[in-house]
């Protein structure tokens, strides 16, 4: 196995394709409470941020249709129930209330205007290996590389 370099990854940012970036920016800003920085006039790219979480939006070509029906992004928060209540008050369509999962997270999902499924989750008992990984890696199993 090749050794891992000493410099750590800092963060990741999902990049979501959008058919109408103006509508998507408005949804993320007005409904989900993110700040937006845009590029182009009219915008063709945006980076949205709330706290330390960033999500990018990219205007997709008219002939491209690529939407995952699984999670497009999983965003970790400190209080998932409070966030759910905030989004409920903002009128966000919420398919179900937060649920506690077997992988030690409490979560709910929203669909953005392009059908991207965005999950918001709270780690219930933090593990040094990261959310969900402690149960699978380290104690009696090895990470796959």
Please provide the spans of the model-predicted regions:
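Amphipathic alpha-helical segments
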Residues: 22-36
């Amino acid at each position: 196995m090749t050794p891992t370099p000493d410099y750590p990854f800092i963060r990741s940012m999902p990049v979501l394709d959008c058919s109408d970036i103006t509508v998507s920016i408005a949804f993320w800003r007005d409904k989900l409470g993110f700040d937006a920085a845009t590029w182009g006039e009219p915008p063709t790219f945006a980076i949205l941020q709330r706290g330390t979480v960033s999500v990018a939006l990219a205007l997709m070509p008219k002939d491209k249709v690529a939407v995952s029906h699984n999670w497009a992004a999983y965003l970790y928060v400190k209080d998932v129930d409070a966030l759910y209540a905030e989004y409920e008050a903002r009128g966000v369509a919420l398919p179900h209330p937060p649920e506690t999962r077997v992988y030690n997270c409490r979560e709910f999902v929203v669909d953005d205007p392009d059908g991207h499924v965005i999950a918001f989750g709270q780690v219930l008992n933090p593990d040094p290996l990261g959310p969900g990984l402690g149960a699978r890696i380290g104690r009696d199993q090895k990470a796959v590389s």
